[in-house]
Amino acid sequence: MQHTMSFRIFLRRYATKHDLSKVRNIGIIAHIDAGKTTTTERMLYYSGKINRIGDVDQGDTITDYLPQERSRGITIQSAAISFNWKKDYKINLIDTPGHADFTFEVIRSLKVLDSCVTILDSVAGVEAQTEKVWKQSSGLPKICFLNKMDRVGAGFSRTVKELVVKMNTRALLINTPIFQVDPVTNESKFSGVLDLIYGKQLIWDTNDPDKINVTDVDENHDCYEYLVRGREALVETLGETDESIVEHFFNDADGEYLNVSPEVLNASIRKATISLSATPVLCGASFRNIGVQPLLDAIANYLPSPSEARPPELNHKNVPITQNPLTGLVLNKNPNLCVALAFKVITDAIRGTMIFIRVYSGVLRSNHTVYNTTTGTKFKIGKLVRMHANVPEEVNELYPGDIGVLTGSNVSEHIRTGDTIVTHVTKKDGLRSFDKNVELTLKINPIEIPPPVFNAAIEPKTLGNKKPMEQALSQLTREDPSLVVTHDEETGQTLLSGMGELHLDIARDRLLNELNAQVDVERVIVSYKETLNHSTQEKTLETDDGYKITAVIEPLDEEMKAKAKKDEEWFSLANDNNFMIMEKHTKYDPDKNWPFQVPYVAVVNALLPSSLVALQRGGKIGGFPLSSCVIRIKNDWDLPIDAPSISPLLTLSRQLFTQILLGEDQSNYSVLEPVMNVDVTVQQQDMGPVIQDLSSARKANILSIEDENTNTVSESNIRFQHIADKMWLPEDPTLEFAKLGKEGQAPKMVKAQAPLKEMVAYNNKIRSITQGRGSFNMYYHGMQPVTHDRLQSVLADYHQ
C-alpha cells in the first residue's frame, strides 16, 4: 500500500512538471551537404533559442562548434540541443554528420532517438549516404524535408518519386512548392509553399527572415487546382491504411476532399507516421529561410513522444515493458526503476568527463547512487546537465525521454559508451530493493560499432612522449569507440584505426593540436583482418586449485546469431564483428543456485578482455587482428566456491585462447579486406574509360549501369514503383535540362563494388578520366576474403 501511494504522489508531481506527450527526440540525418546544420540553425532561430542565424561557411553555427568543424565546414560529431516550439513542445534535437567516415556518430545517435528528420537535397535527389542512413534508422518514424528548392535543377516531384521507390515508403505531401516569376529575369523562383492541410499559400520575404505572407487559397486563387488535387491525393493515400479517415470522408465531409478537417488529417498523418505506414514530406530552402516553421509544426504534429516510440531492446527478452502516457516506460512492472543508456563520452576542459545518456524509464536525479549493469559496479553521480550544443545547463533531474549528461569525479572510470545504468527513482541509494537477477542485470542491447577500414602508425617523438601519447589515444578512443588502438608485437608499432582517411585526419589533428601529443603519424593504409576458415579444436586448461575452462573458437556464420540457442549468452567484442558465447553451465544458474563468492557478471567481465586480447593478437598470414570469430566458452568451466578473485581465471583464459590459436595451421586462416560500394556519376561520353578503369585497375565488380534519374526497379520495390507512378505530383519548373549533359542525355550512374585498397586516391583518377565531369560516392559494404592473385600485393603493400 505504501509503495502504491508513494508512486501516486510521484505521478502527481511528475505530471505537473513534465508533459511527456509534448516531448520529441529527433535526429537530423542526410547525405553530406544536404543542409542539415543550416536547417538546424534556422530551427533554433525560429524557436527563439538563438537571436542570430549562423552560417556554415562563416563557421559560426551553434551545433558545429569544434574548431575542425568550423574550419572545414562539415559536421564531425553529433551535437545535442533542446528547445521549445510554440511553448508547449520540447524538442531534443541531435544534428548528425553526413560524411560516411563518421557513420558511428550517426549510429550511436539513432540508438537513443525516437524519430528522424531526413533532409534531402532537391537537386541531387536521394543520394547514396541518404539511403544508408535511412536503412540505419529502420524502425524510426521519419519526416522528409526537401531542401534547396531554390537551386537550379531542383526537382520536388522527381525527388519524391525517388523517395517512394528507393526507400519503399508512401509519401504524404504536407506542402508543395510555389514558384513565382521574377519580373527582372522572367524566371520562375521558389518563393514559398502551398499548405495542403490548411489550404494556405505561404510566401516568405527573403529580405526579412521573420516575415511570411499568408493567403487563403479559395476557388479564385491560382493554386486552387493544386490544392484540390493535393488534398485528394493525401486523403486517398491515408485511406489505404486508415479506415477512420475513409468513414469521415463519406459521413462527415460529404465526399468532398476539401471538407476533411485539418484535425482529422493531422491525426491520420500522425497515426501513419508512427506506424511506419507513410512518410510526411515538406519542402523549403533553409539557407533562404523558407519552409522551416512548417517543418517544426510537422515535428510537433506527426512524430512520436517517448511514450509512443519503440521501446529499447533488452538483454532479458521476457521483462515486461509497459507504456504510461504520463511517465513513459515502466520496466519489469517497477515504477521506481530508472534505466538509462550511455551513448557518448566527451572531455570538457572545465567539467572533465561528460557522459551523454538517454533516460528510458523513471527519473534520474543528481547525486544519486547508480549501478552499471554492464560492468557490475555501483557509484555516485554528481550534477546533471542538459547540453545546448557546447553550452551546459545544470538540472536537478532528467525525465523519461530526456537526453542529458552525467558529471562527477566517478563517471570517467565507471561508464563507457554503450553501458546501461539503473538507479532508484526516489531513494538516493535504493539499489538493494531491486531484483538482483533481473533489474541489476538488465541491459539495453549495446551500440554496434562498425569495423575500422584504415590504419595509421603512430610513434612518440621521444621515449618521454610515450606515456602522454598513450593517454591522448585513450581519450580519443574513449570519446570515439570507432577509433581503435592496437599494438603490433612484432614491429612494436602502435596503430590507430578508423573509418576513413578523413576520420584519421581529424584524429591526427586532435592529437597534435588539441591534446598536444608529441607524435609522428605515418601514412594511412588500408586495415586488413584475418578470420578462421573452420572451427578450432576444443581445448581445456585447468589448475590444481580448482580453476577450469574449456573453449573452442569458431568462424562467425551470418545465421549463427539468428539461430542462437536459449542456453547460450552472446557478448560483443568491440568492433571487429567478434563475439564471446557463454554456454549455460551444466550445474550452476546465476539466477537460482549460484554458489560462488564472486558474482557471475565478474566471471563474464574477466573472460571478455581475455577474448578480445587473444583475437587482437592476429592470425598467421599477415599478423592481422581476427575478425568475424566467436570464442565459445563451454558449459563445464569451474572455479573454487570461496575464490575471492577471478584473476586466476583471467590468466588461465588468456593462456587457453592463445594456445588454441597458436595450435591452428596457417591454412585455417584467410585475409579479409574492406570492400566498398561505389556509385560513379558520369556523362555518356565518359562511360567507356570509367568502366574500363573500374574493371581493370580497381578490380571492381560492376553491378549495374542506369540513368541517374531513373529508379532501378527490383522485385522488392515494384509495388512502390507502381505507387510512385500513380501519385499526383506538381510540375518541376526548375528542372528543364539542368541535369542533362551537353548532348542532351541524362548522366549515368555506375554501381560497383571494389576493394578499398584499389579505390585509394580514386578522386583524382575520376577527375582525370572525365576532365572534371565525373563524381563518385563510396561507402562500406563489408569484409571479404582477399583473392589469391592479390594476396602477395596486399601483404607487401601493408608491411612496406
Curated annotation (Swiss-Prot):
Matches recorded under InterPro entries: EFG2 (IPR030851), EFG_II (IPR041095), EFG_III (IPR009022), EFG_III/V (IPR035647), EFG_V (IPR035649), EFG_V-like (IPR000640), EFTu-like_2 (IPR004161), G_TR_CS (IPR031157)
Alphabetical list of Pfam families matching this protein: EFG_C, EFG_III, GTP_EFTU, GTP_EFTU_D2
Entry GO CC: mitochondrion
Further details from the record: This protein may be expected to contain an N-terminal transit peptide but none has been predicted.
Disulfide bond sites: none
Organism: Kluyveromyces lactis (strain ATCC 8585 / CBS 2359 / DSM 70799 / NBRC 1267 / NRRL Y-1140 / WM37) (Yeast)
HAMAP family: mEF_G_2
Positions bound to GTP: 30-37, 95-99, 147-150
GO biological process: mitochondrial translation; ribosome disassembly
Function statement: Mitochondrial GTPase that mediates the disassembly of ribosomes from messenger RNA at the termination of mitochondrial protein biosynthesis. Not involved in the GTP-dependent ribosomal translocation step during translation elongation.
Ranges where the tr-type G domain occurs: 21-307
Gene giving rise to this polypeptide: MEF2
Family as reported in the entry's similarity comment: Belongs to the TRAFAC class translation factor GTPase superfamily. Classic translation factor GTPase family. EF-G/EF-2 subfamily.
CDD domains: EF-G, EFG_III, EFG_mtEFG_C, mtEFG2_II_like
Transmembrane stretches, start-end: none
Protein name, per record: Ribosome-releasing factor 2, mitochondrial
Keyword terms: GTP-binding, Mitochondrion, Nucleotide-binding, Protein biosynthesis
Record bears the keyword Transferase: no
Lineage top rank: taxon: Eukaryota
Entry's localization field: Mitochondrion
Organism taxonomic ancestry: Eukaryota, Fungi, Dikarya, Ascomycota, Saccharomycotina
Keyword check for Amino-acid biosynthesis: no
One function term, GO molecular function aspect: GTPase activity
